[in-house]
Structure formats: structure tokens, C-alpha cells
């Protein structure tokens, strides 16, 4: 079976997010897994790390690629990354879910199409 190299990649910077949300590893793990499920992705594994004195990284390994968040609670900042291979999963659904949960004051987003030759931005 031959697989397509086509993929969608969304990267997001969130600013003005509540400190307590960004420093709660269990809250973030729960919601990243739920976001992945809502997007149609298949979760294979979750890796997570708490940093001292603040900050969290959660990586959700997907059959279709990955969803991750890196937080800097003391700066009210989170970096989110969602890459999905193929056409069966919609990373925008996962990103929208997370943004709605974290309620940032502002965000910056880039949408990329990958695996078609050149990397193409779609925003």
C-alpha cells in the first residue's frame, strides 16, 4: 500500500492565557487527548513533562502524526503544534478545541500544507 505524503500542519502561539491552566499538566493532557479525538485522530501515546518552577510540555503521539503544547505560565504563553498526515484528520478541529479551552487574549497562527513539494502557507 502506498501512502500519500500530504499533510496539514498548524502552529499557534497563544498569549494572555491564565497561569493556572498553563501549569496544570493533567488538565492539559486531558484536553489535548480530547482535542485529538474530536479531530478524528487516533492517539497512540502521551508523553508529558513538568518543569520547575513552572511550565509543561505535553506531546500526544498520533497514528497520523502529533499534537503538542509547550507552556510558559509565568509569561502567560503557550506554543501549540498539530501536524496530521493524509486527509482523514482535520487539525483545525483540535486547535479550535484547545483555543476555546485556554481562551487566550491574542493568538498568532500559521497553517501549512506539507508533503506536496514546497511547503505552502494557507493563511
Where are these regions (language model features)?
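Polybasic/polar functional segments that serve as interface/processing modules
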Residues: 1-123
Amino acid at each position: 500500500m502506498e501512502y500519500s505524503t500530504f499533510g496539514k500542519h498548524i502552529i499557534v502561539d497563544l498569549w494572555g492565557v491564565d497561569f493556572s491552566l498553563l501549569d496544570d499538566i493533567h488538565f492539559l493532557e486531558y484536553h489535548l487527548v480530547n482535542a485529538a479525538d474530536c479531530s478524528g485522530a487516533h492517539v497512540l501515546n502521551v508523553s508529558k513533562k513538568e518543569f520547575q518552577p513552572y511550565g509543561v510540555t505535553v506531546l500526544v503521539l498520533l497514528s497520523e502524526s502529533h499534537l503538542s503544547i509547550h507552556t510558559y505560565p509565568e509569561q502567560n504563553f503557550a506554543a501549540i503544534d498539530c501536524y496530521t498526515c493524509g486527509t482523514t484528520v482535520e487539525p483545525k478541529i483540535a486547535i479550535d478545541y484547545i483555543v476555546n479551552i485556554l481562551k487566550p487574549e491574542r493568538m498568532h497562527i500559521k497553517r501549512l500544507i506539507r508533503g506536496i513539494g514546497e511547503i505552502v502557507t494557507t493563511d
